[in-house]
Each structure stands twice: as structure tokens, then as C-alpha cells.
Amino acid sequence: MRPFARAALCLLAAAGHLAQAQFPPRPEGVTVLESKFGGGARISYKEPGLCETTEGVKSYAGYVHLPPGTLKDLGVEQDYPINTFFWFFEARKDPENAPLSIWMNGGPGSSSMFGMMTENGPCFVNPDSNSTRLNPHSWNNEVNMLYLDQPVQVGLSYDTLANFTRNLVTDEITKLEPGDPIPEQNATFLVGTYASRNMDTTAKGTRNAAIALWHFAQVWFQEFPGYHPRDSRISIATESYGGRYGPAFTAFFEEQNQKIKDGTWNGSEGNRHVLHLDTLMIVNGCIDRLVQWPAYPQMAYNNTYSIEAVNASIHEGMLDALYREGGCRDKINHCRSISAVSDPENIGINAMVNDVCKDAETFCSTEVRDPYQEFSGRNYYDIGQLDPSPFPAPFYMAWLNQPHVQAALGVPLNWTQSNDVVTTAFRAIGDYPRPGWLEDLAYLLENGIKVSLVYGDRDYACNWFGGELSSLAINYTDTQNFHNAGYAGIQVNSSYIGGQVRQYGNLSFSRVYEAGHEVPSYQPETALQIFHRALFNKDIATGTIDTSSRREDGKFYGSSGPSDSFVFKNEPPPQHVHFCHILDTSTCTKEQIESVENGTAVVRSWIVVDSNSTSLFPEVVGSAEPTPMPGAALVSGRIKFHVHVIKSFDYYIFI
């Protein structure tokens, strides 16, 4: 999704017209189950009846509540509760016999509601931000889907709840203590209920997040009453920073599986459930920094769309910063060498390692990656589009904070897209450039778990050149067989080739044509076909060849074709018709943001009214007279807005 850092403000959640309306309604009708294994864990849930409206298809939204101390059995001191939000959708077809996939967006710190509501979930939100329509290419067509907000404090997940005030002009956030009066609000001073915003009460890095999620899985898969599968396979699909989440989480889960199986796991009875892991899918993932950094200068200067987003001089500067003595590559190698000695588990226990690794990421981001953003004028998640870009449309951002949605979900807090506190916690230990991600992928492949890497070929943030380099850098038994496989066209349907794929057995790398960072948003049918083929043991190219067993020559299926996908070129796309949605200011020009701040903008349903938006959404913004949106005050025929923001930051969040 968008880097909620490019604009001066990060508008995250709509506030109500009155002060009290900005707090979510008290949850009602929630079923609460205490864990049968004791220890204080609980599950709470509702059937919301939202989004998935296909007749007979159930969905459940709720929380797994883990009390303080839950993670101690795996060496993590956790003196705070972890309340992890989930939204589970049955498969539309034969859910009892369907496998299950978890979906997580990245960040770190980004809500998976973005992926659910703009990429691969059962519904999309309409431009009115108040209603939804079904997604015919939803990934729950044939797979049970479990969407998670993690780590704690992301999206609708929380540690402890608190009320805050926010000054939109000074960017000051102040906690309201119990008993404090609710202050009077105006266009730039607001209140809301959120997680604590305490950096010490969220996961510090990917490894610690894996431990928390494994405990969630132990509770949910054993005790959630709405899931009774005959097919026990569990897959994980993730995106962007999921290039780290996916390998680390899945490998950690498998390590615990093996300990449980061989009797070396000494934890409680409730934590001895083997998770039948099947497939890891990574969509436009930033996997390994050392391997993928060279892809940024290439994508900016020499891509398959013939877009020179930077000139030759800037391109050379990016390469120099990468390869010169003491540059990006050397800094990452230094980070990795000292972390291997002083923090081999990558859990942030050594301050010197944290600082060195954080410094490496800061230098590399600033000098190797960011010149594209500074000089190109093009979108970070789609090189084919100029900034600002309105795609994927952010209508879901207001919908998730509508009172009727909050009530149906049974959530006690306001939803936010991205939490900068979580991002900062990961950055504080230098999580980005640390080692181990490719080794985790090799471990999964050696243990029979499929790995499917899927990359839209217009993304810059975690681009396909870097994804391809990562796929070729996985060192496992069949590395050479994978290298020897050629690129085959991805036959999406009888008339469309959706990209190119290299595959050998359980490992595939797919380049998807005409897609930015969020592949399912751009190419929903292609993404769905790749997802199904990976999970159901079919070749990615055609979906007709079984990939689970060896051929007569003793080898697994391998794709055939050219060794290099760069030979397949594209034409630059037309520009999206621009509109500004005030809850995502990366869709807005500087002038539009200023007009919202000074009250001269006319806004309906969070959309700034102009000729473009009137043409695109006449049913929403096309009426003759300005009408206040929820949470807005009509002043002299113009609208002043009550909106939430979070602290802007000088780095990019990968959604």
C-alpha cells in the first residue's frame, strides 16, 4: 500500500461528529471462551455478518487474548497482555474440506485489513465508505482464510487501551488519564481510543513476533469452535515486510513442530499442537537486504517498462553508495558478522548490534533506495504511476471506523492502518538487514514446505529484480535444478498470459505483468490462480501438472523456457485518474492537503470534490450542494474536518 510518510500528515481514521462518537461502542454479543488448558488464555468472537455476504458462508471476527507471561516458555519476558485480532472467513466452496491460509500484511506495523479489503478478501468497500460489494476473485473461494493484525498494537490488535488527544498542527499526542475530562474538539484537536503506543509492549523484531504468533496459533487452531477442518493443511501468505515475516514465522513454527514430534518440547500441554504447514507465499516481499539492494538502482534506471526514473548520474551514485568501501554492502556485512556472534537469535539483546544494524539500514535506505523517491516524481509502489496515486482506493479506511462496523466486529478501539510505534520497535534493533531469511526458506524447502514467490513487475518498494535475486540465492538441495528451470508463461485463462514463472518442484518465482506492490489489487485473476495452484500442488504456469511427486527420471516438475525474464518487455500504463481521499494523504497533492487544513476544501465521504472525483464518483460527490461528511463541520459552505493522524516519520512503511 502507500508509504504513510510521504505527506506532511498521515490521516488514519475518521472521527465522529461529536466527541463521544469518536470512541467505539462498547462491544456487545461477544462470545468468550476460556482456554481448556488453563493459563488465562481466552478467545472472544462474533459473527459480524459483514463483507462476506455470500449465502451460507460464515465469518467470525474476534481476539485471542494472551495474558502476561505467556511467552516466557520460549524465553521472552512479556509483562503485558497480547490481544490479537483475527477475521476468519470460511471458504465459499466446501469449507469442511478446504485448506486454510493465514494472510498478513507487512509494515512492520501495518494492518492486514488493507490486504483483506483491497487485495484478496471477500469484499471491497464502495466509494461511499459505508457499503461493500463482493470480490469474485476472493482467496476464500476455495480456501479458508484467516486475516491477522500482528504484532500486538497493529490495526485492531492491542495490549492495553488508552484514550489520546491529538493536535494535528503541532503533531502532539497526549494520553488522557482516567478521570480526565474529554476536552472540547475542533478541526485540529481530536480524541480517540487506541493501543497503548508503548514501544516496550510490542514485538521487538521479527523473531519475537514469531514467538507471539506461534502462541496465538496454538490457542486458535486447537480451541476456536468455528474451524473444524478435515483438511488440516495450514499455509501462510504475506506481503512486503512479509518477506521477513513469512520465512521467519513459518520456519519457527516448523522448528516447534519438530520439537513436539521428537519429544524435546518441554512446554505446557496446551502448546503441543503440531501445525501442518503446507505453503509459504510471499507477495512482493523484501526478503534479504544484502541480496536485494542492487535491485533498486536497476529498477529505477533499467526496467522492462523502459522508464528511466532517475538519470545516469543519480543511478551511478546509487551504485557507488552500495559498493564503495564502507558503503551499504559493507555496513550490512558488518551488521551480520557481529549479530552472528552477539545476537544469533536476532532478538535485540545487544545494544551495539542493534545500533550497527540500524545504522546500516538507515544508510542504505537513504543512499541506495531513496534517490528514486527524491528525484523521480513516481510512485513508490508502482513505477508506472506518477505521484500522488489513488490506487488501491482507500475507501476501507473510513468503513472500518464506522460505528456499525465497530459494533459488528465487537472491537473496543479505533482502527488504524499503520502504527509507527511498532515500526520504530523493529527499527530500534535493526531488524531489516539482519541475516537468516534465505536460510529459513532453505529450511522450509528441505522439510517439504512449498515456497511461492510472487512479484508485480511495476513495484519499486520490493521489486521483482530483487525477488528474482532472492529466489536464486536460496541454497538448498535442488538449487541447481531451480536455476536450470526456464521461464514459462503463466496461462491465467484461455486468452491471457499473466506473467512468467520459474519453478522446480516446491519452489517457484513468478513475475506478474502490469502489477505494482499489491499484486492481487492489480491482477486479481492472475494472483488467485497462482495462489490456488501453489496450494493445490499444480504447476504455476498452467495449473494442469501435478508437482507433488517425482517423474520417472527421479526429478520433480521443472518449468521450461528462457533463462532470463527481462527479455519480456512492457509498455508504460496510462495514468490513473487522480482523486484525493483525506484519510490517505498520499493520494493528495500538497495544495489539496493545505485546502483541507485551512477549511477551503469541499469534501464528501472523505473525498475532496473536484472535476475528477465528480466524474469518478457522481453518486457520492456529485450533488449540487456541499454536505458535511460524518465528523465534519460545515462552515460558510465549506467543510472543516475532524480526522486522526499519527506521527509522521522519515522512513517508508512496507504494507
UniProtKB/Swiss-Prot annotation:
Its Enzyme Commission number? Answer: 3.4.16.6
Assigned GO CC terms: fungal-type vacuole; plasma membrane; side of membrane
- Which chain positions lie within coiled-coil regions? none
Organism's domain of life? Answer: Eukaryota
Task: Write one Gene Ontology MF term.
Answer: serine-type carboxypeptidase activity
UniProt keyword list: Carboxypeptidase, Cell membrane, Disulfide bond, Glycoprotein, GPI-anchor, Hydrolase, Lipoprotein, Membrane, Protease, Signal, Virulence
Among InterPro entries, the record links this protein to: AB_hydrolase_fold, Peptidase_S10, Ser_caboxypep_ser_AS
Q: Where in the cell is it found?
A: Cell membrane
Residues in the active site? S240, D459, H517
Enumerate the residues binding substrate.
C462, E518
Provide the glycosylation site positions. N130, N163, N186, N266, N302, N311, N414, N475, N493, N506, N598, N612
Look up and give the membrane topology term: Lipid-anchor; GPI-anchor
Which cysteines does the record link by disulfide bonds? Answer: C51-C123, C328-C364, C335-C357
Gene Ontology biological process terms in this record = proteolysis
> Could you say which protein family the record assigns here?
Belongs to the peptidase S10 family.
User: Its function?
Assistant: Extracellular serine carboxypeptidase that contributes to pathogenicity.
Q: Which PANTHER family match?
A: CARBOXYPEPTIDASE, SERINE PROTEASE FAMILY S10 SERINE CARBOXYPEPTIDASE
Name this protein carries in UniProt: Carboxypeptidase S1 homolog B
